[in-house]
UniProtKB/Swiss-Prot annotation:
Subunit composition and interactions: Homodimer.
Function text: Minor component of the myelin sheath. May be involved in completion and/or maintenance of the myelin sheath and in cell-cell communication. Mediates homophilic cell-cell adhesion.
Protein name: Myelin-oligodendrocyte glycoprotein
PROSITE patterns (UniProt xref): IG_LIKE
Signal peptide: 1-27
Primary location group: membrane
Regions of this protein lying in the Extracellular compartment: 28-152, 230-245
Gene Ontology CC terms: external side of plasma membrane
Gene name per UniProt: MOG
Disulfide bonds: 51-125
Residue ranges of coiled coil: none
Membrane disposition: Multi-pass membrane protein
Glycosylation sites: 58
Pfam entry (one): V-set
Length: 245
């Protein structure tokens, strides 16, 4: 009787194995694994947030989704084999896509197009199989390719082309001016070689008189002749008035 009432060692082992099986079936069917480091994306580009279950198994019939706090805003939801676009938050409608090529192995990726600064922060991925659900958190870091450029640098970048153009025009002008001066200097030297040095030492008033007299001489002679002719005709006209017959 004593031997029958005392539990045997194999009975204990069977009981422990049964507990482990039940706990593995209901307490830990799978776990969700996300990226261990923040996902980086540039403004305007696309970001991909991977998520998977372990151990891997077919997740086609599961409910898969991403949401954000606060208020558990739905970023993307997959249920009954279809994307539930109507349940998305307004800011993500038309911008997300669930990549399901490896969903048979329990691997999916959420693609967010046209990334914006408000997209930066935490996302939560979840897998739900009937009443069992597991989830994993991940971070998205959004960067601007010009984040390092201060307003002063932007102003400098805008002014530099104009300044460069002005400097270029100024250098071209100085070059042309120097070339023109050299040409004029050469022409003046040629004139010095052409003219007699003795002529160049003549006083200026003599040169002026030498140039003006040939021009004004005929003009003065013409004026004198005109006055003489005018007086002669006037005298004849007066004489005819005195002796009409």
């Amino acid at each position: 009787m004593a031997s029958l009432s005392k539990p045997s060692l194999p009975s204990y082992l069977c009981f422990l194995l049964l507990l482990l099986h039940v706990s593995s079936s209901y307490g830990g069917q799978f776990r969700v694994i996300g990226p261990s480091h923040p996902i980086q994306a540039l403004v305007g580009d696309a970001a991909e947030l991977p998520c998977r279950i372990s151990p891997g198994k077919n997740a086609t019939g599961m409910e898969v989704g991403w949401y954000r706090s606060p208020f558990s805003r739905v970023v993307h939801l997959y249920r009954n084999g279809k994307d539930q676009d109507g349940e998305q938050a307004p800011e993500y409608r038309g911008r997300t896509e669930l990549l399901k090529d490896d969903i048979g192995e329990g691997k999916v990726t959420l693609k967010i197009r046209n990334v914006r600064f408000p997209d930066e922060g935490g996302f939560t991925c979840f897998f739900r199989d009937h009443s069992y659900q597991e989830e994993a958190a991940m971070q998205l870091k959004v960067e601007d390719p010009f984040y390092w450029v201060s307003p002063g640098v932007l102003v400098l970048l805008a002014v530099l082309p104009v300044l460069f153009l002005q400097i270029t025009v100024g250098l071209v002008f100085l070059y042309l001016q120097h070339r023109l001066r050299g040409k004029l200097r050469a022409e003046i030297e040629n004139l010095h070689r052409t003219f007699d040095p003795h002529f160049l030492r003549v006083p200026c008033w003599k040169i002026t008189l030498f140039v003006i007299v040939p021009v004004l001489g005929p003009l003065v002679a013409l004026i004198i002749c005109y006055n003489w002719l005018h007086r002669r005709l006037a005298g004849q006209f007066l004489e005819e008035l005195r002796n009409p017959f």
